[in-house]
A protein has these predicted regions:
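Sec-dependent signal peptide recognition
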Residues: 2-10
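Short acidic/polar N-terminal linker immediately downstream of export determinants
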Residues: 25-30
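Short, isolated positions in well-ordered beta-strands
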Residues: 31-33, 56, 151, 180
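A composition-driven surface/loop motif
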Residues: 68-188
Length: 188
């Protein structure tokens, strides 16, 4: 018994020496929660798991795993592919952003609760789609980084623009160095 307790203690010490991240996959969204920030994770009525204020219906979770991925707080990475979109969200802001997509047409709603305490959210956009768009609403400033994005909106779902940001505050747009970015709005 003493050997088992020593082994578990040693394993816990070794695990804490490496930055660990709890990854929660729901459809095309990967939420990444640094273990150092997660705290208590209430499991309610066998149907809901809450991590850092973000509620997940257990039935909606496709996969959960732990790895040593470094997580940048306040970041959302969006990668467009021909007919879909993959999203990675930092756990500290997971409860403040919601996503809806139809193929590569993506809508992001940033909660009205985002403020100076939460901080500015940075969205990195990359990938390529000949029929996609980004529509985003929010009431607090944000940053949108174009990081090798080719996006054409041929059949609008949310708006006619390749990127349409409706924000109550400043939106900082940046084009990452050494990248080519092409945006084409829908005809009309």
């Amino acid at each position: 018994m003493k050997k088992l307790a020593t082994f578990i203690y040693t394993l816990a010490i070794a695990a804490s020496a490496v930055a660990q991240t709890l990854n929660v996959a729901v459809d095309n969204i990967l939420y990444q929660f640094p273990a150092s920030q997660t705290g208590a994770m209430p499991y309610t009525d066998g149907t809901t798991l809450t991590i850092m204020g973000k509620e997940f219906r257990v039935a909606d979770i496709d996969n959960m795993y732990i790895d040593d991925t470094a997580v940048t707080d306040n970041s959302v990475d969006v990668v467009f592919s021909q007919s879909d979109v993959a999203i990675t969200v930092a756990g500290n802001i997971a409860k403040y952003v919601s996503f809806t997509n139809s193929g590569a047409h993506l809508s992001i709603i940033q909660s009205a609760d985002v403020d100076d305490a939460v901080g500015e959210i940075a969205y990195s956009l990359s990938g390529s789609s000949s029929d996609g768009e980004l529509y985003m609403e929010g009431a607090y400033k944000c940053e949108v980084d174009l990081n090798g994005l080719t996006l054409t909106n041929t059949a609008p779902v949310y708006s006619g623009a390749a990127i349409n940001i409706m924000n109550g505050k400043r939106v900082k747009i940046s084009v990452k160095k050494s990248t080519v970015n092409t945006l084409t709005d829908a005809a009309g």
